[in-house]
Amino acid sequence: MQLTESLGIVLFNRNYREDDKLVKIFTEVAGKQMFFVKHISRSKMSSIIQPLTIADFIFKLNDTGLSYVVDYSNVNTYRYINNDIFRLAYASYVLALADAAIADNESDSHLFTFLKKTLDLMEEGLDYEILTNIFEIQILDRFGISLNFHECAICHRTDLPLDFSHRFSAVLCSEHYYKDNRRNHLDPNVIYLLSRFQKITFDDLRTISLNKDIKKKLRQFIDELYHDYVGIKLKSKTFIDNLVKWGDIMK
């Protein structure tokens, strides 16, 4: 059992026996790991095992069983996110997506950095819906999905109107619409934004502002992509869907 130090983000915890907990932490150096916390009611760790807690952890990794947290420091609990039910719902969904996208014990420092930066920007007050859309699009490759929103799948032109084709898992230009009579008939702005989301940098995020109509169209199409290509529906996403139904009442 080796001693390791790493930044980590708590994904979730669950009960284990009467007074113990299992805590899954996404670590920067060792991927997602499950940790055993004994006697949680008397443990100093009771305050840092909640989801959306980030800290520097020292832990013992066990290759064959449960691992153990030895110590922690520099704890951040994303207070702004936790004080807003909508922001919290989207942040929880992003956590769940990261958890679903890679296997446990598999190091992925790039995804860790992307997740942390997404949460940091949500905490700063940036648009959590747009941040979530960008996270959803850029994480598709972790599910083995590669979609082309940039150029026509047939002629590679980018200067004509484009529409998405499930048949080609890519966009078609107007001269090749006939190749798929069941193309999506998407708003051109949706195609443009998805192409931009695939390669956008964090510095660019601060300049994006979208109206409600475009946000709704993005949400509907990304939901369609996840249904058709990824095939998962997370509980945290269902909670968001329910929130949207009565969101105007709460805002």
UniProtKB/Swiss-Prot annotation:
Can you cite a GO biological process for this protein? double-strand break repair
Answer whether the UniProt record assigns the keyword Phosphoprotein to this protein: no
In the record, the note on similarity to other proteins reads:
Belongs to the RecO family.
Stated role: Involved in DNA repair and RecF pathway recombination.
This chain belongs to the protein called DNA repair protein RecO
Instruction: Give the organism the record lists.
Output: Streptococcus pyogenes serotype M1
Q: Which NCBIfam families match?
A: reco (TIGR00613)
Name the gene.
recO
Q: Does the keyword Chloroplast apply?
A: no
Any GO CC annotation of this UniProt entry: bacterial nucleoid
Matches recorded under InterPro entries = ARFGAP/RecO, DNA_rep/recomb_RecO_N, NA-bd_OB-fold, RecO, RecO_C
Q: Which of UniProt's keywords are assigned here?
A: DNA damage, DNA recombination, DNA repair
A single Pfam family it belongs to is RecO_N
